[in-house]
Every structure is written in structure tokens, then in C-alpha cells.
């Protein structure tokens, strides 16, 4: 049986941290920012962690 391929789209969107959690970028922070307030755009540029219910599924895609 051949090796499992990692999901290239998931690899571009998610990163595994050293402690084993999965990091992601927030949506809606790349363009059309002129009508969003400054506090919101600042928060959108910060990365966050993936929810624990989806973590196992995403790890399987990026570490396959």
C-alpha cells in the first residue's frame, strides 16, 4: 500500500505547534478592510488555535 499523501490545501492553512496544537489564521482579514474598524482588523491579523473537536482531523491531513 502506498504512503498517505498530506492534504496540500490544509498544509498551506494550518501549522502544528511544538506542543501538538494546531494554529490557523483568522478569516476576513486580507481585503475589504476599509469598512471594518481598527480594533477588528488588528484582531483579524492575529493567529489563533483550532478548536479541539477538529484538531485530530486536521492533524491527520497535515501530518499524513
From Swiss-Prot:
One Gene Ontology term of the molecular function aspect: structural constituent of ribosome
Q: List, alphabetically, the Gene3D superfamilies matched.
A: 4.10.410.60
Can you supply one Gene Ontology CC term for this chain's record? cytosolic large ribosomal subunit
Keywords, A to Z, come to: Ribonucleoprotein, Ribosomal protein
Compositional bias annotation for Basic and acidic residues: 25-35
What are the recorded Gene Ontology BP terms?
translation
Which InterPro entries would you find in this protein's record? Ribosomal_bL35, Ribosomal_bL35-like, Ribosomal_bL35_CS, Ribosomal_bL35_sf
The keyword Ribonucleoprotein appears for this protein = yes
Ranges for the region named Disordered are 17-41
Q: Which family does it belong to?
A: Belongs to the bacterial ribosomal protein bL35 family.
Kindly give the PANTHER family that the UniProt entry links to this protein: 54S RIBOSOMAL PROTEIN BL35M, LARGE RIBOSOMAL SUBUNIT PROTEIN BL35M
Any idea what this protein is called? Large ribosomal subunit protein bL35
- State the organism of origin: Chlorobaculum parvum (strain DSM 263 / NCIMB 8327)
